[in-house]
Structures are given as C-alpha cells and as structure tokens.
Amino acid sequence: VILVVEGSPSYAMRALESIQNQDLYDLQIVVVCRDAAPGVRHSLQVAADRDIHIDLIDVEDAKRGACLRAGFAASRGSQIIAMNADEWLAPQSLSKMVDIACDTAADIVFPTVSLDRYDAHRERHSRVLNVAPIVIEDKSSMVSGLSQLILGGLVAQTSGVMYSRSLFEACLLCDKVFRTVGFMACALSRAQCVSGCGDACFHAAAPKLTDAFDPTMYAKVSDDIRALDELADSLSEADSGGRLKLASQKFYFAGLVACIENLCLSPHGVSSIERSARMRDMLEAPRTRQMVAALKDNHRGLGLLFGPIASAKPTRCVMCTHLAAFLNRTGAKTA
C-alpha cells in the first residue's frame, strides 16, 4: 500500500492505522512524505520505528506524480493500492480484495467506495458507490461491466483500487495522471481480468464543488470524457446495443452539471459577465451538443438542468442551478 502524505493532513494517522489494522501479515506500507508538517512527519516516523512493515521515504520533487512514482519504486508487492492521507480502509477490506485477486487472477479489484464529507459538527455524511459483483474477462463482459462502473461513478475512482504490479507500472510508464479517468481507462484497456469486491470498503473524501471556483474544472471533465470515449470506441464492436456509449453520455452530463454548480454556487466565484461567457462556452461545446442529441429521448431522472442545457440558455441554467440547490437543501424531490 502506497500512502501519500502532503502538507499537514489532520487524518494522516487514521489512514496509516487503518492499513496497519488490516488482517494481512504479508503487507508492505510505503509512506511517502512531501512537504509534511513537522508534527505529522514526527508521528509517522514514530510509527515507522515501531512497525517493520512501514517504509518511510521523503520526496522533494515537486512534479505531479513524483510521490506515486517514488512510492512504487520502493514497493515490492505483487498487488498495489495507492491512497492519500484523508482516505482510509475499512477493517478486513484488504484481505478480502487480495482473496478476490488470487481467486480470479484479476488485474484490477474494485472495492465499494464511501465518499465522506464532514459537517460543522464533525458528523460524517456518506454517499456509497456500490461495486457490483462484476467479473470482466473479455470484450463482451467489458461492455456490461464498464457500463456499470461508469454509471456507478467508480470509473473515476483510482485510489483504493487494487492493481497488479505490472498493470500499475504500465499506467505509470504511459505517463497517465493518477486520480483521473485517463489513468483508469489506461488500466482497463490493458487488464485481462477485472473483479469487484463488494464486501471491501474504501473511504474517500467527497469532492467539494462549491468551496471555490475552479477555472480548470471543465477542462478536466473534457479530458476525462475524451479518455472514456477512446475506451468506448475500442469496444464499439462488442457494444452492439450502445449501452457503453449511453453510459458515457450520462457520465459527461454529470460532469457538466458539476461544472455548472461550481460556476454558479461558489461563494468566491466570478463576475456575471465572465460567468455568462463560461456558461455559454460549456453549453455550446460540440461534446455538449452531442450529449444532448444522444440523451434527448432518454433523459428521465437527469434532473432540472437537462432542459436548460439542451436549449443552451445560460440564464436558465443559472436559475435552475440555484433552484436545484434550494430543493436539495429542503429535501424536496425533483423528477
């Protein structure tokens, strides 16, 4: 397990202890520190001195992915899991995933993922991404299995997932950025067998969409859907019913809605002129119009924003975004 610790995360020791407490003896924990606060670094050093399973290394390279590469270089295991200090493993999850990997010879094992956020009273609120008992062994099963992963949101979850060592190395050599759909698409395109382990649970921090405006968010969504489209195109012969293409369109719609929410609801956002311009660019993007055309007869359950997005009306999108946020706060349901 590669645990990356940067800055002064308040939950670093919880993450480490969740790995140490796994019911698995043959385990190496590589803790990679970069710019870690002195107090956090000291606590990790004390833990490493007490546990022979822990290898603690420091990284000064500021390049993206340097911590992961250093951690992988120091690792020796046949299976790899990478995670950050604000994430943690539920008890016995690791051993259950190892059992699945050994029983099915899987290159990738997905756990159930709990996306956690904490309110002002430090109470945890979770959204669970359940992994179906999938077994992907050929292109036909890849279409059905990948459709489930896309619709369930797990295709964007790279941390907490177990990879075979050779597969993880291949993705790193392709210079794919971890925590992107591009990394997962690269892994899935090379995997011989993929399995799901619903009994294992990995806790990750829920994405924060409205804390601050992120001008790069739509570019990231565009990169993600491009990687997903390339993977879907490679499986087009097996996707005779168009399930995979439909799942990709819904994934893009969800990402677009998140971008619109970030643009409209961020407390420290942008001017109304810039907001309208950015909104228009997203609504008129060729990929957005393609999605609208694909989902126009299958948009039930997509919420209030599909209509304004389909009509490419920036003002209506802003109004419906605020209305949807109000209805979510009050607990009202929308079609």
Language model: regions and residue ranges:
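Active-site acidic Asp-centered loop
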Residues: 34, 83-85
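Acidic donor-binding segment of Leloir-type glycosyltransferases
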Residues: 20-58
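Short aromatic/hydrophobic "clamp" motif used to bind/position activated sugar donors
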Residues: 80
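Membrane-interface aromatic/basic loop that binds lipid-linked glycans or pyrophosphate carriers
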Residues: 87, 105-106, 265-335
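Short, well-formed alpha-helical segments that are part of the catalytic scaffolds
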Residues: 7-21, 39
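Donor-binding/catalytic cores of nucleotide-activated saccharide
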Residues: 88-197, 204-217
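Catalytic core of nucleotide-sugar-dependent glycosyltransferases
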Residues: 199-207, 212-240, 258, 266-288
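Glycine-rich, basic loop-to-helix element that forms the pyrophosphate-binding segment
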Residues: 59-75
